[in-house]
Amino acid sequence: MKIFRSIDITRKQITSIALEILVLLPCLFVFVSAHSLAQDTRYNDNESASSPVGEVSLVIGKAFLSSANMRGLRVRSGDFIREGDTIRTESNGHVHVRFIDEAVLSVRPRSELQVLAYRFDEANPENSLVKLNLLEGTARTVSGEAAKTARERFRLNTPIAAIGVRGTDFVVSATADSLKALVNDGAIVVAPFSTQCLQGGTGPCNFNSVELGGGSMQILE
């Protein structure tokens, strides 16, 4: 047997309840908004965060930005890039970054790239340091002042080889066991990792290396 309990609510009570809801709604909105912003560390006042070294100038499709304090947030135009950040693109994703020395980086679809170090010393450009790590996929880099001035302190790592520059515009495609490099302008130095060419190093490796000039392509396996 079902028992139904009737509840009598007067018009005055309904009006009172409605007013309470209207008062509480703004508070609820503020709480939800604050909670959402707290979850997105891009909005946190994190004094320990390093200074920006670049800014996202273009995003097409799906791409994500991660760091030690931030996990897989969607990349947006205008986002700052810092040392330690990782950019990951999906099958339709493109991300362009302009760095503090006017270098340009393009991360193409199905790619993952880490900004290990980016230190541009405007007063003494020869002391600058740039180190990138292309875990997989394709990236294009157009050298800025740091790479042009401190060539011995620029390195782009891939899973199997190190790439140094000679003032360059080049494209690299990498997998776990292969690498393809195309030079549009300038030159690059490509060397497989070995005891004479360590992943933790900076600058080009000279041991067992190949130098590629403009218009040339190299495939390593």
What is the role of each PLM region?
Residues 36-95, 99-221:
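Flexible, surface-exposed loop/linker segments and immediately adjacent secondary-structure boundaries
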Residues 1-16:
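N-terminal secretory signal peptides that target proteins for export/translocation
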Residues 18-31:
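Bacterial N-terminal signal peptides
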Residues 6, 31-33:
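Generic detector of N-terminal low-structure segments
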